[in-house]
Amino acid sequence: MNVYLIVKAKVPKNIVNEFDEWYQKYHLSDAHFSFKSLKAFRCWINENEHHAYYKFKNIDIANNVIKGKSLEKMVKTFDKKWQGQVTRSRELIEIIQEV
């Protein structure tokens, strides 16, 4: 079954618009390309919690991304842009059933 890497970000309210524009124009597509994900999409939860989802065929592929240079590169890009203003976490979820 498919696996999703979920990146959750807490964005200060005063930079939500700037963050949203940057993620839309640059980061989502760059990460999708870099990770070689099957699909990538994002959403907002409440006013300032952003989630990005990257879909992979299986857990092994997703784990390789988590441990690999592509994630390291994207983290550096993110950190350079947001200078510690945005906190984030990552988790993998493995789909076990679909209807």
Protein language model features and the residues they cover:
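Active-site-flanking beta-strand signature of metal-NTP-handling nucleotidyl enzymes
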Residues: N2-A9, H51-A52
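Residue-level signal for secondary-structure boundary sites
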Residues: I15, D60-A62, E98
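Short amphipathic alpha-helical segments
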Residues: I15-K39
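Short acidic/glycine-enriched loop/turn segments that link adjacent beta-strands
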Residues: N46-H50
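Short, low-order "capping/linker" segments at domain edges
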Residues: L92-V99
